[in-house]
Amino acid sequence: MLVLGIESSCDETGLALYDTGAGLLAHALHSQIAMHRDYGGVVPELASRDHIRRVLPLLEQVLADAGRTRQDIDAIAFTQGPGLAGALLVGASVANALGFALNVPMVGVHHLEGHLLSPLLTREPPPFPFVALLVSGGHTQLMEVRGIGDYTLLGETLDDAAGEAFDKTAKLLGLGYPGGPEVSRLAEFGIPGAFALPRPMLHSGNLDFSFAGLKTAVLTQTRKLANTCEQDRANLARAFVDAIVDVLAAKSMAALKQTGHKRLVVAGGVGANRQLRERLDQMGKQRKIDVYYPDLAFCTDNGAMIAFAGAMRLQAAPELARHEYGYGVTPRWDLADIRLPSAA
């Protein structure tokens, strides 16, 4: 079964072709970072318009790269939500039109499920069950994953997500957009321990997160340093990253202990952070925990994860395949709502 995946939930247009027999055949991505940089964040209307311009050329690109035609497509998976409504509608509209024209079934994919399953695209995918640390954009969650469509929320952020804290800290430090990679790069030059920042909810006794207080602590420090030199900024960035990593790593290990699982999967944009990977690898080795990550190319939003997640859902529940071409979008969508009947 050849599945076309379409991702357009925010500021990346991603398309991919995944074959359930041969694996990932082709994927293409256009990032809008340069377009939004002048605004310091994503402008929804501009994002939607750019998706319109990019999606069909990217479709032709992945077909050419895979040596396939539109008529070879057996099913279409698209990001139904969550995300920016206008951006999601672009992908949904193209998916509906293609599905109708080709008379192939469609399946709407939860964006976070795409991230959750992206490490399964690696050469050595993790077997079920496992604990997943999902740190993508506006989401920070710990999930117990027992199979496709069988997910249990263990803990989540009560306010800012880790990615949002990175972006806001970048602005406080006068860094560019996107903030996460900029903060991480600057932190490489920082001196450990130069600033003392809190580790919110580190000892809360549950698996929830909170990063709003950490952001406020960074703001307080920047105000104290009216004439911040480059080394001070690097030191503060290092203190911030260390605090985030400490909390994410500790909560992940607590989730593994609570569930009894020995495998941890890390997914989402923050999952590309080098310091976080090194800490989790170190702690995993000490505790005999296997830690898995997606390829760096698939940490950010992409079409490959949507094609793969759609293919896995169609294999697990063929009844999801719909020849109805009026699919809408779900900008706000709880991951618990996509539980498959077989997982009940």
Curated annotation (Swiss-Prot):
Keyword Acyltransferase appears in the UniProt entry: yes
GO cellular component: cytoplasm
GO molecular function, one term: N(6)-L-threonylcarbamoyladenine synthase activity
Cofactor binding note from Swiss-Prot or TrEMBL: Binds 1 Fe(2+) ion per subunit.
Record-listed Fe cation binding positions: 111, 115, 301
InterPro entries membership: ATPase_NBD, Gcp-like_dom, KAE1/TsaD, TsaD
Positions of transmembrane segments: none
Binding-site positions, substrate: 134-138, 167, 180, 273
Domain of life: Bacteria
Cofactor(s) named in the record: Fe(2+)
Pfam families to which the protein is assigned, alphabetical: TsaD (PF00814)
Keyword Cytoplasm applies: yes
GO biological process, alphabetically ordered: tRNA threonylcarbamoyladenosine modification
Compartments reported by the entry: Cytoplasm
Enzymatic reactions: L-threonylcarbamoyladenylate + adenosine(37) in tRNA = N(6)-L-threonylcarbamoyladenosine(37) in tRNA + AMP + H(+)
Entry EC no(s): 2.3.1.234
Function: Required for the formation of a threonylcarbamoyl group on adenosine at position 37 (t(6)A37) in tRNAs that read codons beginning with adenine. Is involved in the transfer of the threonylcarbamoyl moiety of threonylcarbamoyl-AMP (TC-AMP) to the N6 group of A37, together with TsaE and TsaB. TsaD likely plays a direct catalytic role in this reaction.
Family: Belongs to the KAE1 / TsaD family.
Entry protein name: tRNA N6-adenosine threonylcarbamoyltransferase
Species name: Cupriavidus necator (strain ATCC 17699 / DSM 428 / KCTC 22496 / NCIMB 10442 / H16 / Stanier 337)
